[in-house]
Amino acid sequence: MKQKYSKKSKKWIYITTIIFILILDISSKHLIIKYIKTYDTKKIFSVLNFFHVHNHGAAFSFLSDQNGWQKWFLSTVSILTILVMTRIITKLKKQETKKITAYSLIIAGATGNLIDRIFYGFVVDFIDIHINDWHFATFNIADCSIFIGIIILMRINYST
C-alpha cells in the first residue's frame, strides 16, 4: 500500500507541473499569435519586449536555415526526450522531489515546443530580453521551463 501512495504522489507532482507549464506556454503563444503580428515588437519593460518570431530550428535558431527535415528530426528528439525523462521519473524515489520537478519541467518544455512543431511547423518564440541594442536570443515559456529544469539538475548533480 505504501508503494502505491508513493507512486501516486510522484505522479501528482510531475503531472501537475507539466500541465501548469503547458497551459502557460500554449496560452502565451496563442495570445502572441492573436495580438502581435509576426516580426512585430511590443515593448513591455525597458529590457523586455514581446517580439513574435517563428523558429524553424532549435535553441538559438540552430538548424533553422535547413529545408524542412529539421522539423521531423527535432520532433523525434523531443519525443525521445519526453519518453526518457518520463522513464527516469518513474524510477526515482518519492523523496527526490527536486529531480522529479526538474525532469517534469524539461518534459513540459519539450512537449510545448513539440506541440508547436506539429501544429505550425515551427516554434513560436516571443520573449526578447535586451540591453540597449544588444538582444539575447528570442525564446518562449517552454524554453524557460527546459532551461530551469537543466539548471536544477546541474545544481543537484554538482552540489553533492
Swiss-Prot record:
Per the record's keyword annotation, is Membrane included, yes or no? yes
Assigned EC number: 3.4.23.36
- Keywords assigned by UniProt, alphabetized: Aspartyl protease, Cell inner membrane, Cell membrane, Hydrolase, Membrane, Protease, Transmembrane, Transmembrane helix
Q: Which domain of life is it from?
A: Bacteria
- What would be an example GO MF term here? aspartic-type endopeptidase activity
List the pathway annotation.
Protein modification; lipoprotein biosynthesis (signal peptide cleavage)
Q: How is it placed in the membrane, per its record?
A: Multi-pass membrane protein
Q: Which residues form the active site?
A: D125, D143
Q: Which GO terms describe its cellular component?
A: plasma membrane
* BP terms from Gene Ontology: proteolysis
Disulfide bond entries: none
Q: Which residues cross the membrane?
A: 13-33, 72-92, 104-124, 134-154
Where, subcellularly, is it found?
Cell inner membrane
Its recorded reaction(s) are:
Release of signal peptides from bacterial membrane prolipoproteins. Hydrolyzes -Xaa-Yaa-Zaa-|-(S,diacylglyceryl)Cys-, in which Xaa is hydrophobic (preferably Leu), and Yaa (Ala or Ser) and Zaa (Gly or Ala) have small, neutral side chains
Task: Describe the task this protein carries out.
Answer: This protein specifically catalyzes the removal of signal peptides from prolipoproteins.
| Stated family | Belongs to the peptidase A8 family.
Alphabetical list of PANTHER family matching this protein: LIPOPROTEIN SIGNAL PEPTIDASE
Query: What is the official name of this protein in its record?
Result: Lipoprotein signal peptidase
Q: Which organism is it from?
A: Buchnera aphidicola subsp. Acyrthosiphon pisum (strain Tuc7)
